[in-house]
Amino acid sequence: MKRTALLFIAFTLSLSVFATSISVRILTTKVITSFIVSPVNGSYRIYGDGVLLAETDASGIYQLTLDNDSIQLKSFEKTLGRFGAVKLISQQVDGAFKIKSVVSESKVRTYEDDIYVSLTADHKQLQVINKVDIEKYIGGVVESESGSRTSGEYYKLQAILCRTYLLAHINRHVLEGFQVCDDVHCQAYLSRTVDPEVQKSVDATKGLVVVDDDLNLITAAFHSNCGGETVASQDVWAVSTSYLKSVKDTFCLHQPHAHWKRSIPLEDWKAYLQLKHKYPVDDSLKFVDATSFAQGNGRAIYFTDRDLKIPLKTIRADFQLKSTYFSIEQQGESVIFDGRGYGHGVGLCQEGAMRMADLKYSYKEILNFYYRGVHLVDLSALNYFRQE
């Protein structure tokens, strides 16, 4: 059974796991009709519709602009032409470029390796793709998700989880001409790695992923802060797993996102319950329940445990609350949401894991604290089974 599962993994991942690079659409949160790009390290060859146009280094600055059904490419000196596709290909393994949308509030971002530019299917904007080494991409994701504020053991764990998530979703956008995007829909990827400790941790865990007892890649869920107790997967996504179970977590209790408060006008709260959920707010007992809800010894799934059950995740989404881990108390003409944690609460609690790393827990110990009964697998070990 185990060997059969390995064969299945090797087959399904053979086109992706052993590839060295990945295509990531960047700048996806903005409508890109024009941007400026310039190398910051190494030299780049510039191609328009497959024809070599120029070779440039850090002194070169280029603007690409949507022009009807084509891409206009300009340097400071001249217009190089209009094309259906433009590529900037690094000539060194450590090539990097900076890019900025021609919008005043946009920030400069820096990425490594190559850049491919084409039109979106509707020809209304530019599609900008970073063709990048997978391990460099993972480093960028780890830093985008975690920042530069913790220890190497945490970065190692986050790298493994990011790699696992990537390989489980590696062709999410393949029909759109790329593999993953740079937003949280896939994984946040806002720049290349800047902190050398991050890339060092990525390199130290190269090829490692997490699998369950059936040797399937796990759902590598994580969130900012669980508020003291993580949530089982079935209570958020209605999908039960053997490894995403509720875990009591004291490590995150004194971290930045452990507590929050929100005040909502009482009349707004009553109207919401009545109009959306047909909650009988005029019933005196039900009104007490609606204004004195508490989560005591464990996290609740529903707003009430009586006849009418309203999912807490629905209330969280409707009021844009930080978590579902909250209690409610009436204070005058308001209801106060006294909350704990930040995020959906499933899987790794990032702030708890960071605290564990600071306390000298190893990345393997942290992994097994939040994900029960999982295993680390080196993808290179699958070569044997792939060749059988």
Which residue stretches match the model-derived regions?
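Conserved, single-site charged/polar hotspot
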Residues: 7-11, 16-388
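Positively charged n-region of N-terminal signal peptides that target proteins for export
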Residues: 1-4
